[in-house]
Amino acid sequence: MGNPETNAGNTGSSIEASVGEGGALEERRKMRIKGFIALLTDPSLDSRWKAAEALGLEGDASAVEPLINALKDPYVDVQWLAAKSLGQLGDTRALEPLIEALKSEDKWLRTGAAWGLGKLQDYRAIDPLIPLLKDKKKLVRKTAAWALGRIGDERAGAALTETLSDEAGEVRDAAQKALDAIKNKKTGKNPDAASQI
């Protein structure tokens, strides 16, 4: 069985070692995030879009402002991934920049911004998202419907109901799922319904 005092000493050393390793892991994670943030301004397009995507997966709030700046990158590859990553981070500092990005001429940035707003689930995005249900690009319309369902406010109900007659089946399906999510949220049947869209 061993000497309890010796075993206690070993346990303490193990805990200290674990804490030390955890601190080292956290330090490496912070360095990795700083590296990705630096890559957002790299001359290489591939480096910038990969960094924008990685920062969303890292989930660190220190990336919010750099990703907001990346919404203005000259290439849409970076812009739309920055928008998606901002949604993944879930920080409301991204709300206004994402709403502004909905006005872009590029369908990919509008799509990424709508997706990001859906992930944020902030009621202030409802009115800016509704016009996208009539966007000329079906991917934008579909993503806007999805986002409105995720937000789950009945103020979007009339516009989503109108979208049930969209020419594209996938847009109609997204609108129906969004309406179901709003209904379920209101009745309390399935509070997570919006996340299943």
Regions found by a protein language model. Give the residues of each.
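N-terminal "cap/leader" segments of large eukaryotic alpha-helical scaffolds
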Residues: G2-D42, K50
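Amphipathic alpha-helical scaffolding segments comprising HEAT/armadillo-like alpha-solenoid repeats
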Residues: T6, E27-T41, E58-K72, D91-K103, ...
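Core register positions within helices of long alpha-helical scaffolds
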Residues: G23-E27, A54, S85, G116-K119, ...
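Positions within the helices of HEAT/ARM-like alpha-solenoid repeats
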Residues: D46-R48, D77-Q79, W108-R110, L139-R141, ...
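Helix-adjacent hinge/juxtasegments
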Residues: Q88-G90, E105-L109
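Strongly charged, low-complexity linkers/loops
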Residues: D127, D135-W146, R150
